Curated annotation (Swiss-Prot):
Protein name as it appears in the record: Cytochrome P450 ARB_01131
Classification lineage: Eukaryota, Fungi, Dikarya, Ascomycota, Pezizomycotina
Family as reported in the entry's similarity comment: Belongs to the cytochrome P450 family.
Catalytic class of the enzyme: oxidoreductase
Keywords: Glycoprotein, Heme, Iron, Metal-binding, Monooxygenase, Oxidoreductase, Signal
Family matches, as Gene3D superfamilies: Cytochrome P450
Length: 499
């Protein structure tokens, strides 16, 4: 009797699901036909469920060359293709027209590929004044943090700059969030365990990156190590959030300068006093501000020491424009912005090593992409509700049909005389459309100023002699989380100039 009752309850539900799925499939087919959509190419997987691609991804990740797999798959499957992995269908693309559609045109307004709608827009408006009204204070903090970095270089002159760059951007991003220098944050008990936090933050990102590649089966990865890392990160930020909440609860007199200063956490506290919301917002900003800029600095110095001709040309520009040596003046904001060759160098670094090399959006309703369907890839293609579209900026920035036969090479001169002014969405160092990075001007200033000060202070900057010789560009070990950092560090030999 019980089994009969269960059958009577379950069978109608199964029938309902099947009918609903069938009707949805018919609606999708009709929608696709009305838009002229055709099926995209399939990816190169040979095993059921794409398991061979998963095995290959694990192998490449162990070698710390996962982005090389992306390049190979684009070469094998084309600029836009369909992937089927573990029962989930998705689209991958490195086609600028498709990425533009995802980020700015038909996928905006109605909420396509955005998960947080009005909340995201409101958070963005809260952050905008930090970069619009605090330019001078932000620049002063960059100067302060760069001086700390320079003083951290050991007397031997042989140093891995990558962790120092992460420390630098950690300082400046904490300032953006909380409005204090790192020493004053320490005195308030907010910091003091930066290394522990950094290790946990990095470990958490490693797990998130691997879980993301498993799609709906992300829960297979986790465990105590991941939970402990999350707790360390949460505790670190929660301490600062509690300080801000207590600060906002006390009535006190403030100076005119303090009234004019915009502090992100203070503005956020005026909107919500929910600690978990405040923590999540701060962690988002910390990731965007610390990791992306630190990685850009790391790749910039690696590429400069690997290309002495470019480094020499950049030194000449700094010497002629600002001056070199211990008696040279610190560059101003306007001077950094006027260094045209430095701008070309940073552009080229961000082309080869974009801050966020892989990204994706999930469709909240059935829609289309403008190209990638049909045998020649010129027809529109269907993207069903819930399906993800991944786009690999790292691979797109290496397309030879966009950047020429030497697209894999580091050549800042390719940007001279606006030679690539029409590249459009083929160049996305800071995303695009409504979600373009608010902090890009600050990040470029931070990178540019740091590079100039290093060149002014150290008369020689060369590749350090290590046991393992440096790999060719693009074949080095990389660590891919939400950003791409160097798996080999940034080992250099530096010698300070004399008066």
């Amino acid at each position: 009797m019980l089994s009969l009752i269960v059958a009577c309850l379950v069978l109608p539900l199964i029938c309902y699901k099947l009918v609903r799925s069938y009707n949805q499939s018919r609606e999708d087919e009709q929608f696709a036909a009305s838009k002229g959509c055709q099926p995209p190419r399939k990816w190169s997987a040979k095993w059921p469920l794409g398991l061979d691609m998963l095995v290959k991804a694990v192998r490449y990740e162990k070698r710390q060359q996962i982005l090389q797999l992306f390049l190979e798959e684009v070469a094998a499957s084309g600029s836009t293709f369909e992937q089927n992995l573990l029962f989930a269908r998705g689209i991958d693309t490195v086609e600028p027209r498709n990425i533009e559609a995802i980020l700015s045109t038909q996928f905006t307004g109605s909420g396509i590929f955005t998960q947080d709608g009005p909340q995201w827009k409101h958070s963005r408006e809260l952050l905008r004044p930090q970069f619009m009204t605090n330019r001078f204070r932000n620049f002063e903090q960059i100067r302060h943090a760069v001086n700390n970095l320079i003083s951290s270089v050991p007397d031997s002159g042989v140093v891995d700059l990558q962790p120092l760059f992460f420390r630098l951007t950690f300082e400046t991003t904490l300032f953006l969030l909380f409005g204090h220098y790192l020493p004053s944050l320490k005195s308030e008990g907010i910091t003091g365990h930066e290394s522990q936090f950094a290790n946990a933050f990095n470990l958490g990102q490693d797990y998130l990156a691997q879980r993301g590649r498993l799609g709906d089966l992300y829960w297979l990865l986790g465990g105590r190590e991941f939970k402990d890392a999350c707790k360390v990160c949460h505790d670190f930020i929660d301490n600062a959030v509690q300080k801000a909440l207590k600060h906002s609860s006390r009535e006190k007199k403030v100076s005119d300068e303090e009234k004019e200063t915009y502090v992100f956490i203070d503005a956020l506290v005026q909107e919500t006093r929910e600690p978990s919301v405040l923590r999540d917002q701060c962690l988002n900003i910390l990731l965007a501000g610390r990791d992306t800029t630190a990685c850009c600095l790391t790749w910039t110095l690696r590429l400069l020491v690997q290309h002495p001709d470019v480094l020499s040309k950049l030194r000449d520009e700094v010497r002629d424009t600002i001056g070199m040596g211990p008696d040279a003046p610190d560059p101003t904001i306007s001077q950094v912005k006027k260094l045209s060759y430095l701008s070309l160098v940073i552009k080229e670094v961000l082309r080869l090593y974009p801050s966020v090399p892989v990204n994706s959006r999930a469709a909240v309703k059935t829609t289309t992409l403008p190209t990638g369907g049909g045998p020649d890839g010129s027809a529109p293609l269907l993207v069903r509700r819930g399906e993800a579209v991944g786009y690999c900026v790292y691979a797109m920035h290496r397309r030879k049909d966009i950047y020429g036969p030497d697209a894999d090479c580091f050549r800042p001169e390719r940007w001279e005389n606006d030679a690539l002014k029409d590249v459009g969405y083929g160049y996305l160092p800071f995303n695009g459309g409504p979600r373009i990075c608010l902090g890009q001007e600050f990040a470029l200033l931070e990178v540019g100023y740091t590079v100039v000060r290093l060149l002014q202070t150290f008369e020689t900057i060369e590749e350090a002699e290590t046991k393992v010789p440096g790999a060719p560009l693009g074949e080095e070990k990389q660590t891919l989380t939400l950003v791409v950092s160097s798996g080999e560090g940034c080992w250099v030999s530096m010698k300070k100039g004399t008066k």
